[in-house]
Amino acid sequence: MAALVPDLPKVELQIVEMTNQVRREQNLNALRINAMLAKAARAYAERLARSGQFSHTADGGNPGKRAETAGYKPCAVAENIAMDRSGQGFDTGQLAMQAVAGWMNSAPHRANILMASATEIGVGVAKSPDPVPKYISVEMFGRPASEGVKFEVVNTSADIVAYRFLGKTRDLKPRMTITQSSCSVGEITFTKPAGFLSSGSEIARFSPENGKRYTLKSGVNGAISIEIGINIKSR
């Protein structure tokens, strides 16, 4: 019996659909297909299939460089690769399912699929010239530079304020300004540190927006307010 032969363009689309289904189940945004990421993924899948190599650095580069070569301007890039082999071949859905299932059963690959900051995806699948049917799948995730977040925090109050973003906390002294750039999404939290006669308390928290300035101001009875405006430098 002849080996099954999958429709590779349909396999690519089904991998995207399955990936987005997993993300939706985790309350994450669905990824949109980006032609440049797809170009990079296909080119690398074909290279791995031809060469017999299987790594993220088989071409001497890395996922970010491959994305840039294809014309993508990344803020963040991640990559999954899979190799599936069977003497019976694969039908279209089976090959897509096997690639995604393998990634989901691997912690680092699963983390890429569930990358909260990713907004775009490109998938490439290629057949190896080996006599036994073997397929290479490459899945690239990206967030373009145009979707990076840059904002400013200014402390005009008379107090030190703790500022926490993406797991890192800094103390903002009076008259201190911080400019933050990030490819990841997350909340920014402002807290008034605990004192000798008072416990620390949260002032406010936001999902920071690109180009915004968050200004801390002294209010009545020691209260601190936050004014949100446009950061002219980030326009």
Walk through the language-model features, giving the residues of each.
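Short, surface-exposed beta-strand/strand-loop-strand elements in extracellular ectodomains
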Residues: 158-168
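Asparagine-centered strand-capping/turn motif at beta-strand->loop junctions
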Residues: 147-160, 218
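Short, well-ordered surface patches within globular domains
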Residues: 3-68, 115-122, 130
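Intrinsically disordered, low-complexity Pro/Gly/Ser/Thr-rich segments with frequent PxxP/GP/PP motifs
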Residues: 166-185
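A short, solvent-exposed beta-strand micro-motif common in secreted/extracellular proteins
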Residues: 184-198, 202-203
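Extracellular beta-sheet/turn segments enriched in Thr/Pro/Gly and aliphatic residues
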Residues: 199-235
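A well-ordered secondary-structure block
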Residues: 63-140
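Beta-strand-rich domain onsets/edges
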Residues: 2, 139-145
